[in-house]
Amino acid sequence: MFSRYEIPGHPFAPIVISCLLIYLASIWGLGRKRNLNAGAGTKPKTSEKPKEKKGLGSKGKGDAMTTLPTQRVSSQDTERISAFKSLLTGLPTTSSVPASLATIGVNICLALFSLDFVFRGLILYPTENLSFSRVGHVSSTSARIFVREPNKNLPIRVSYQEIDGLGDGRPMKAGTLYSLDDTSDYTSPISISGLKPSTKYRYSLSNNQSGVFYTAPQPGSPGSKQLRFISSSCIKPNFPYRPFSHPFRIHGVDILTSTLEKLGSSLRPAFMLFLGDFIYIDVPWRFGSSVKHYRDEYRRVYSSPSWHVSPDSPANIPWIHTLDDHEIANDWASGNITAPYPAAADPYLHYHVSVNPPIPRNPHAIASNTTYFSFTHGPASFFLLDTRTYRSRPLNENSTMLGSAQLQSLLEYILYPEPEGVKWKFITSSVPFTKNWHIGTPDTWGGFLNERHELLSAMWRAERDLGVRVVLLSGDRHEFAATRFPDPILASTSTPESFSGPGTGIHEFCAGPLSQFYLPVRTYSQEDIEDIAIKYVPDGNSKFGSISIATDKVNGEEVSRMNYSLYVDGKEVWRYSLVTPLVKKRRPLPPGELEMDIVDSWASRFEGWTLHAREKLGLVWRVIETCWDEMIKIGR
């Protein structure tokens, strides 16, 4: 994404070390030259006395003299300027030994930080003995649990019990795992069935792993009219880098956990749609491309202390995963046979696909080879695309991102009439559907415009004929953007004002990263009236979307309302609303509405900075505030 190499991609580590060695060599050479000059008795040049000119018509010693002006700079001033320049630029100086030592120390520390980021987790925190469990897809009557256990604690007995406000129910046996081996990296999915809808359960394993989950509501029940879930993409442990943090800590997951805790249990998401780049095999350094190397990366992420927090671990939220390029290689478009895809697919299948939702009703492919998924939860159905496994090279007339089987399955899903009460169709893509990003566009749907148009045509038809709303969710970009795609049949009667901002059409919300970097370079802009820009939020190292659906009334008519809330670094900064009538009517769907926007509020941004500083600095911040108040008093 963005470029040929991801930041901080694998070219950067050797460049940093090479630059340090060159820098230290130049320091050594400069010091050696200075010593040689000192040994040869070389003295620094001194300033000459000012020359005197005789005045016009002068005749002797007593004649008037004029002195040419000269500027004298003391050696102390020269040293001070040189020291400042050395500290500012990092260049060595012969005029100030302390400044040179300081700048050398800073450069060595920065290089050591780079080595620490690359190697500390690899060397000091081995992951082969990771024992871990998490919740996968949960339906109204079943749940999937992922478990990894390499420590010979077999067999593993699985039990579960109902939890309510009156106490825990009687433990029920769900089965036993008798063997785990290296063929699956000591992992296995566990299926629990026969559950009650809309119920909280605790699962327990005999290897001391446990967790909780909530089953989905029964279709057609009052609870099935509501839904809340979250969506994001892209995580890299301990990046942006913090030297005193655990090398596997995922700062964005910590922010997500604390944000959800503040929202309360009533606003708990039913699941997380994580849209790719769960690992970065080539960031900051690709150690290899074997199955072992890819498995190592998954284990490092799951070894993070960010998963092990109380009272409610993020591992208790059902994480549903799709594949993107950094689980394979940057901007991957070489199919599912070319190396390193087979090695990359191994841990993805074991760690994620094994507990993902079921495959579509008609996948048009062999079930064991299908890595796209579909499910229904309450008022919404979902289709999770695989945009990497089947894609061809972009920018050709017949370029395909999905492959023929997945494309056919998706078209059938879009035009399939949903059961009563299901008013939303969500389609997830690991890369943006819009072509408004102007860097790396061929890696997005902008490189597959013919296939994109075929899908948009089907979506417009579904909204016109089926009375459902189609929403696109995507990731990959370390930025947020909301875009809409107006139906050309309806747009022909639109006013020029409708070709910007909120309005009608298929809507896409692209959010990321959950825990990565962002760039100060602006790369998203509207260029035509096909992709209408609604909102662009590039800043923030942690972004996720919270999507909520509930019934509402508009002008006396009962509707299903979806709110998309964007959270940046733990704070809600933007909210957008879409509605669809509960009673099917053959008419255009209402336009989207902006509910909240404080992204460009400098007062709000400054308030957020001060609150963050106050929280992090504690006593130091209070001292700063006190000193500031005293300075104001003195100024008065």
Predicted regions located by residue number:
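Metal-dependent phosphoester/phosphodiester hydrolase catalytic core
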Residues: 1-636
